[in-house]
From Swiss-Prot:
PANTHER family: ENDORIBONUCLEASE YBEY, CHLOROPLASTIC
Single annotated GO MF: RNA endonuclease activity
Enzyme Commission number(s) of this protein: 3.1.-.-
Function: Single strand-specific metallo-endoribonuclease involved in late-stage 70S ribosome quality control and in maturation of the 3' terminus of the 16S rRNA.
Major subcellular location class: cytoplasm
Subcellular location as annotated: Cytoplasm
The protein, known as: Endoribonuclease YbeY
UniProt: Zn(2+) binding residues: H123, H127, H133
Species this chain originates from: Bacillus pumilus (strain SAFR-032)
Protein keywords: Cytoplasm, Endonuclease, Hydrolase, Metal-binding, Nuclease, Ribosome biogenesis, rRNA processing, Zinc
Cellular component annotations (GO), alphabetically ordered: cytoplasm
Length: 159
């Protein structure tokens, strides 16, 4: 199973090795979650200022956040199903991560920058796959999946 990943660090603050680790983690998660072969995802690393603007424009929240996901394959209510779409690899969507919040939260939670970057990446990826945390039950399921993927990959909270 190959996930096609477009990974961009607009800040220049994430090392080549860390970006490669994000790619490996996403491939690992895609395999674990049985994502369709050749599915596409983009991950963009931005500043607090940039994610603040995106959060304000698209979510109506006038503050920076850690991660935002824009799913492209969600079927909305009343949308017509496209015949043959199951044969085409899906474009899952975009994950946007604040490098500043990643650093802050890693320090706050007492683990590595890479563990926090991995957590935010998987959190955003699960949103692209339709998981959310709007109800307590959904939150438990989503967070259990996140933890399992990160632990199985080797990025546990102690990392």
């Amino acid at each position: 199973m190959t996930l096609l990943i477009d990974l961009i660090d607009e800040t220049g603050q994430v090392s080549k090795e860390q970006l490669e680790e994000v790619e490996k983690l996403l491939q690992f998660a895609a395999d674990a979650l049985e994502v369709k072969d050749q599915a596409e995802v983009s991950v963009t690393i931005v500043s607090n200022e940039e994610i603040h603007q995106i959060n304000k424009e698209y979510r109506g929240k006038d503050a920076p956040t850690d991660v935002i996901s824009f799913a492209l394959e969600e079927e909305g209510e009343g949308e017509i199903e496209i015949i043959g779409a199951d044969d085409i690899p899906p474009v899952l969507g975009d994950i946007i991560i604040s490098v500043d919040r990643t650093k802050e939260q890693a320090e706050e939670y007492g683990h590595s920058f890479m563990r926090e970057l991995g957590f935010l990446t998987i959190h955003g990826f699960l949103h692209l796959l339709g998981f959310d945390h709007m109800t307590e039950e959904d939150e438990k399921e989503m967070f259990a999946k996140q933890t399992k993927i990160l632990d199985d990959y080797g990025l546990s909270r102690s990392s």
